[in-house]
Regions:
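Conserved catalytic cysteine-centered active-site region
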Residues: 1-11, 40-48, 55-96, 105, ...
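Short glycine/serine-rich loop segments
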Residues: 97-117
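Beta-strand segments within the central parallel beta-sheet cores of soluble alpha/beta enzyme folds
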Residues: 28-35, 81-84, 109-114, 168-172
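Glycine-rich beta-alpha junction loops
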Residues: 37-39, 114-118, 151, 160
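A short acidic, glycine/proline-enriched capping/turn motif at secondary-structure boundaries
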Residues: 15-16, 33, 38-42
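Conserved active-site "lid/cap" helical segment
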Residues: 1-31
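Condensing-enzyme catalytic core mediating Claisen C-C bond formation in acyl metabolism
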Residues: 135-172
């Protein structure tokens, strides 16, 4: 079984790849995966320390399995990297994807971020006094953040590659 963060990311990736009109990349070395996460396998870490102590949980704790599982799921053969940079990890993964495209190192990069709710990030943000004591209310003057979980993925590709295959281009 997978950590919840990885499972969320695989679903987001599947949707992004399908939306892009792509599928299996056949190990193409010009297809890369960059995924970001604040905590990675926080749920597995939590399970391990709460008494489960299953050796398999240890392998799901780091951030590295996330991008590895995504790359395996689409058979990407290029760069596979995980970004661990708190709240900005997903955004940084998209910037990194753009850099790979601009540098000519990849034609297609699947990029995004994922995190599952667990006591690990909650405890960290609580110790920083970063959590809002009130419920989430967009467009108000809050005094902190409200944590949640989710994943998002986008397919970033060179203009030439997208144009050549007749892709729907959302932005340039």
């Amino acid at each position: 079984s997978l950590d919840r963060a990885t499972a969320l990311c695989l679903t987001a990736t599947s949707e992004a790849v399908a939306d892009a009109g792509l599928s299996d990349f056949g190990g193409n070395p010009r297809v890369s995966v960059i995924m970001g996460s604040c905590v990675g396998g926080g749920r597995s870490l939590e399970s391990y320390y709460r008494g489960g102590k299953q050796p398999a949980d240890v392998l799901k704790m780091p951030i590295s399995p996330i991008a590895n599982h995504v790359a395996e799921s689409v058979h990407a053969g290029g760069v596979v990297t995980n970004v661990a940079n708190a709240c900005a990890a997903g955004t940084i993964s998209i910037a990194y994807a753009s850099d790979l495209i601009r540098a000519g190192k990849a034609d297609v990069v699947i990029a995004g971020g994922t995190d599952a709710f667990s006591s690990v990030p909650y405890s960290g943000f609580l110790s920083l006094h970063a959590l809002d004591e009130n419920s989430c209310s967009p467009f108000n003057r809050s005094h902190g953040i409200t944590l949640g979980e989710g994943a998002g993925a986008v397919v970033v590709e060179s203009y030439e590659h997208a144009k050549a295959r007749g892709a729907h281009i959302y932005c340039e």
